[in-house]
């Protein structure tokens, strides 16, 4: 069976009376080069343990199994259990887990399932839960790389630079935890059903430590969210509106302490500037 052949896919799904779920963001690949190239991009080899999320009918899973020491594939849709039992019957190094990956203890999963293998994530992510999944992967503290296919617009946000339209809170969060790299685009016609948007494969190399030091990481991201929740406001106004216990006087003092113009907007600040601002604001609030 060819898991990227449209006729084979339709026959497979018909055998199991499977219907696509829009709410789960299900789009299955029909271009053989895509899962092969994603699996290659993950760097998986015999010494690698791969966590995959949302295997669909298993076309990427199959490619990962050919390269990795072990693949743990987590699928939310129980209706795919008999489908995957058929398509992955010959993949002895694949373990299927049915459930919501966001409820799993990822460090425990890695420790129990992968042993001494190098843990990575490789997946075609459901677009409707991209941000929560990336957050879970990057904060788990147990993965070397995260190679995923996501909506192109989101991928551009991950790699954006200060002062650009794509730069936002997600950018700062991801770049704080990882070094993102855009790899290649996948057009809509490579899927069934075809999505309305182009997809992009991106690789995140997870940092061993943050790129700059900060006194209070929780406060840092409170500051970041406040800055981007009020993009059209000056940073001083955004901070006073979005950071608990911060009035305009404290916000202005922190901005001045960082050598920033009083009229500056948050969307222009770099990671280092956000960290410095957070530290200054922490000192002001202290």
Question: Where are the regions that the model predicts?
Answer:
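Short helix/strand-capping connector loops at secondary-structure junctions
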Residues: 253-262
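Short helix-coil junctions and helix-kink-helix linkers
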Residues: 240-245
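Short amphipathic alpha-helix in the helical subdomain of ABC transporter nucleotide-binding domains
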Residues: 248-251
């Amino acid at each position: 069976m060819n898991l990227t052949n449209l006729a084979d896919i339709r026959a497979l799904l018909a055998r199991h009376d499977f219907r696509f779920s829009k709410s789960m963001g299900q789009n299955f690949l029909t271009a053989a080069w895509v899962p092969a190239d994603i699996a290659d991009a993950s760097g998986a080899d015999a010494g690698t343990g791969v966590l995959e999320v949302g295997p669909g009918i298993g076309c990427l899973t199959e490619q990962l199994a050919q390269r990795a020491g072990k693949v743990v594939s987590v699928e939310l849709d129980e209706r795919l259990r008999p489908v995957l039992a058929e398509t992955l019957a010959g993949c002895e190094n694949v373990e299927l887990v049915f459930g919501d990956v966001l409820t799993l203890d990822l460090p425990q999963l890695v420790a129990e399932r992968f042993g001494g293998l190098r843990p990575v994530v490789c997946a075609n992510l459901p677009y409707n839960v991209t941000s929560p999944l990336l957050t879970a992967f990057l904060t788990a503290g147990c993965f070397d790389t995260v190679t995923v296919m996501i909506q192109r617009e989101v991928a551009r946000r991950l790699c954006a630079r200060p002062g650009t339209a794509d730069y936002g809170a997600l950018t700062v969060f991801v770049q704080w935890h990882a070094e993102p790299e855009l790899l290649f685009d996948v057009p809509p016609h490579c899927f069934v059903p075809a999505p309305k948007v182009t997809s992009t494969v991106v690789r995140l190399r997870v940092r061993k430590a943050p790129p700059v030091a900060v006194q209070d990481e929780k406060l840092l991201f409170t500051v970041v969210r406040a800055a981007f929740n009020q993009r059209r406001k000056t940073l001083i106004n955004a901070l006073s509106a979005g950071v608990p216990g911060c009035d305009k006087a404290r916000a202005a003092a922190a901005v001045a302490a960082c050598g920033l113009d009083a009229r500056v907007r948050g969307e222009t600040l770099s990671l280092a500037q956000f960290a410095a601002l957070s530290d200054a604001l922490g000192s002001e609030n202290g």
